[in-house]
Amino acid sequence: MDLFNVLKSEFLKLKKDTMFYIGTIITMLVPILVILKDKVISAPPKSAMDWVMTCCLVDFLIFSILSGLVITNLVQKEYQSGTLANILTSAVSRTAFVFSKVVIWFFWYFILLIYIEIVTVLGSKFIYPDEFSMEFVKIVIVMFTKFGLLSFITFIPLLWVTILQKKLFYPSVLVAIAFTGILLGGFNISLDMIFLASLIPWTAVSLISIYQVESPYIIIGITFITLIGIIGLFLSIQSINKQEQ
């Protein structure tokens, strides 16, 4: 079974995946609710950039946790339904299985990331018309894209956890919450902690995406983020290859 056929099968499975739809709907509602809150219920921050930072914090808090739930569900249902037995009997298809989960996960993640960016830009236009400009739009899109893509890479080890836990659910959920906590903790990095933050992949995401730091720290951060993604993928493939039917 090649990767293309596995991906085709994965897309067909999504039609009956309730958790996938729930995660998608909640993720789509959050940025809209933030806009409505600041426009109708309470006064928004004084500057558009402060508002964008709040949106980034709230959106990725929910998005990251739900992302963890989605990948957990994508893998766990294979164990619960017993369909993974067909994968485990074919040494060739095990790696394709891992890559197919990453591709489906990333496809879902990237589409929603673009959606969040669009809603945030429209919200800033709606709430802060005087500060809105194409330069502002560029800043928001670059920041959210960097933060989103880099944070996705740091969450790849979660796939390894979902494979290890098999039919269990909570271990990977707890790990997803922990990753999210560290990730968002990067929003409050002090100057004397920049070097340490660049060594920790999850805090390095904020360092690279939000803060204006010197290039050595950016290079260090990108290096460790890339390493954690590669390690997570390697461990996932190794774990699935070691499992018996």
Residue spans of the language-model regions?
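Aromatic- and glycine-rich beta-strand/loop motifs that create alpha-glucan
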Residues: M1-T24
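Hydrophobic alpha-helical transmembrane segments of multi-pass membrane transport/permease proteins
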Residues: T18-V40, C55-V70, P171-G186, L227-I230
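Hydrophobic core of alpha-helical transmembrane segments in multi-pass integral membrane proteins
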Residues: I26-I35, L113-E117, V121, I222-L235
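Secretory targeting signals
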Residues: P31-S67, F99-Q165, F169, S206-Y217
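Terminal transmembrane helical anchor/hairpin motif
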Residues: K37-D50, S172-Q245
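Hydrophobic/aromatic residues in alpha-helical transmembrane segments
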Residues: S64-I71, L84, P157-L158, P201, ...
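Helix-loop-helix units of permease transmembrane domains in multi-pass membrane transporters
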Residues: N73-F106
